[in-house]
């Protein structure tokens, strides 16, 4: 046997061995180039990641500021609306004693006396006129009886036994209450019915 034949593995021709070794060398070369990553590429990747993070933070900040501005605008609109709606509250509170006095005058007036009829009629017209004016500005009277007690609009002064009115319902009004655009400015002082013992 010749020396060439001895070195080649069985069943392989010398050209095949050379080709196999050449493929092994090529396979090793890409690994070597992958290990030699350019440091500038790493720096570029880092900078791109930092830029993306900064853009995200900036976008979030802008959205947050826009949301805060929108909330501020809404709150301001609500405050202005409430200011317009309830600007008369102090004025109405000052008028309530006058309305109460007119109510009391009608309660104690001797309506059967013909000499007093003109005065009673004048008080009634004045009271009606006053109530019409305040109603134009959103004031409503709380003076219903035989309705369930509502702590938002009623202040219970006493409980009275009653057969006519269901327990827990308003039996009588001692002082009328008033609301301004749905907000209670003075609760009605009421007596509440209770079951007989």
UniProtKB/Swiss-Prot annotation:
Alphabetical list of SUPFAM superfamilies matching this protein: Coiled-coil domain of nucleotide exchange factor GrpE (SSF58014), Head domain of nucleotide exchange factor GrpE (SSF51064)
Pfam annotation, one family: GrpE
Origin: domain of life: Bacteria
Annotated keywords: Chaperone, Cytoplasm, Stress response
Gene3D superfamilies: 3.90.20.20, Head domain of nucleotide exchange factor GrpE
Residue ranges of coiled coil: none
Compartment list: Cytoplasm
Region of interest: Disordered: 1-40
Single Gene Ontology MF annotation: adenyl-nucleotide exchange factor activity
InterPro entries: GrpE, GrpE_coiled_coil, GrpE_head
Quaternary structure, from the entry: Homodimer.
Family the entry assigns: Belongs to the GrpE family.
Function: Participates actively in the response to hyperosmotic and heat shock by preventing the aggregation of stress-denatured proteins, in association with DnaK and GrpE. It is the nucleotide exchange factor for DnaK and may function as a thermosensor. Unfolded proteins bind initially to DnaJ; upon interaction with the DnaJ-bound protein, DnaK hydrolyzes its bound ATP, resulting in the formation of a stable complex. GrpE releases ADP from DnaK; ATP binding to DnaK triggers the release of the substrate protein, thus completing the reaction cycle.
Protein name: Protein GrpE
Source species of the chain: Shigella flexneri serotype 5b (strain 8401)
Lineage: Bacteria, Pseudomonadati, Pseudomonadota, Gammaproteobacteria, Enterobacterales
